[in-house]
Amino acid sequence: TCALPIYWVIEKCITQNLEWGACGYEMKPISINLTRRQFLDPNLMNVVAGLFTKYNYPPELLEFETTEKIFSENFLQARTAAESLHSLGVTLTLDDFGTSFANMIEITSLCVNTLKLKRAFVQDIDSNLGKQEVVRTIYNLCRRFDLHLIAEGVETNREFNKITGIGIKSIQGFYYSRPLLPVDFEKFIGENHL
């Protein structure tokens, strides 16, 4: 695989969001997945702070996603990185939540704003009572600890109805759309009045 340079990706996302804002679209947070190495990069905070200054970009419109595994493997280093990014105003999300053995107490001590529920919890949830109870428990824990919860990988009406019936309001997946190029995204939000 060919990895894109993460600093370039961050800058491109910032400039694309600013372009949409200049075209009259409401600017929404843009989320970028970071690998373990990228998240723990000691230069990341300075680069991001520099981009915020260069483009006069609101920090709350940038979100970084990383997996909970990073925190279970390198808790102190990951917590320091999370605190640094959080101090800039960046939102942090734990992606694929439920794939590792992260301690909920440790998660509440991090500067994490959002958990993204792994697709495995969503798949076949309409017919699996065990999954429904696990998801309901995670949802209630997130509410208790004031964490935003996103169900990722929602593809069908049945999955959507069961997830939203539990109370989860933020959904990601092919239920809405497959990934889109910026020009197609503009058409999509225009057609759907988003």
Q: What annotation goes with each model-predicted range?
A:
Residues T1-C2:
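Single conserved hydrophobic/aromatic residue that forms the stacking wall/gate
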Residues P5-Q77, G153:
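Catalytic core of bacterial c-di-GMP phosphodiesterases, primarily the EAL and HD-GYP domains
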Residues T35-P42, L61-L76, L88-L194:
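EAL-family c-di-GMP phosphodiesterase catalytic domain
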Residues A81:
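Conserved functional hotspot residues or short segments at active or partner-binding sites
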